[in-house]
Amino acid sequence: QPEYLPDLDPLVDLWCLTFRAMPGDVPDGIAALCTQFWTQDIQYPTRASLLDTVRRRFPASFLPLVRLAHALSGTAPDAPSPDTVAAMMNALAHVSSVALILPQRTAGLGLWETLDEAGAPSVTYRLQADMPVAHTQMHVPAGTHGVLISPSGQAPAIVLWQLATPISAWHILHDAFVSSVVPSSSATDPASLESDSPTLLSPDWENDSGSVGVIVAELFADVLQTEEALGEALLAHLGEQEALVPASVALVQAGLASQPLDTRRVYAGYRLLMALLPLRPNDIWQHVRSTNVLIGSPGHVPLLDASVPRSALLTHERRTGVFTGTFCLLDLLYALLEHIQSTQFVDPPSLVQVQASVLARAIGWAGYHIWPDHQQWHYADNPSGWMHLSFKCLRLFSAVLSDPCFLAPLTAKDPPAAVLA
């Protein structure tokens, strides 16, 4: 076992530069490089040594595995690579060890014992009771043996536990991401703040939980968008406790409510919602219907909502001249509209009516606050940014106006296209 590395970033950076598609790269070439790794290089210990190391050091070293998995997935914008994503998913689904911080608050409870083993390279431990994995729903079973891999005397102490039955890193990624963005019922209890801190799982979360959550959300979004069958397989693998939809909405809300507004969180949350839409549409409608996320503002829809709402996201991006979040929001609105149009004659009319009214509010906001004067705005990142904004608005409005339901006479049960009008 290699010595614990407190900072794997330089090595991971090198691999990410090699395997992760950058602007201007040929996506097929990157996918072919990742295919070679998963079909050939993985068989040689020296070539797979970094992946093996970050798997063994997970989750105490949290980000290295996430970043490396993202790079080795072979995905690029608009260029999915199902075979390499499937290989990466499988590698993370079977992890035979976990590196965990020894929880000092339980040191006096006899949760573990130290063993005196001749010739052992470091302090060895044996669990005398099940040990929960902080910030997750998982436990390391009693009887598991571990070895200290952090330098002796260094705090926090990190122990590598060898598991008799492999576990899934996806469950740890999911649980840590969800618990970092979705408020827990005990979040207001001062006595629970220490146990709820994500730094108990990994020092990577210290002072940077927002960034870590964004990177995990981006990984999930890329996998789910690659192929619907792979997305369904991943959600099924996560099981009944899967909660990516509320976590996505919470990530957007957190980004919109932060000061200054965190566009990266907002963008990552919208992307994950779009990736989940074909797989969990009803959950998404349930969680967005009472919020302002579809107009780019935090909080909930007021009971008396007669005025056209304003958007914290649009206000922020008009000031900066960079409209990354607004572009993604308009893409999400278009995806939601496509979903309504494809299911409006299948879903119950009452459900479709609610969905249409929710979307009508958001499209009305776009027509009132974006369309009239977006050509006069300042675009810092791209002088032709107004053209991109025009295209996304026109695509959205055209999809509404071209709906065949407009040709039908209006009744007491108006079709969704009429509501959107």
Functional labels for PLM-detected ranges:
Residues 1-421:
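Extended alpha-helical scaffold regions
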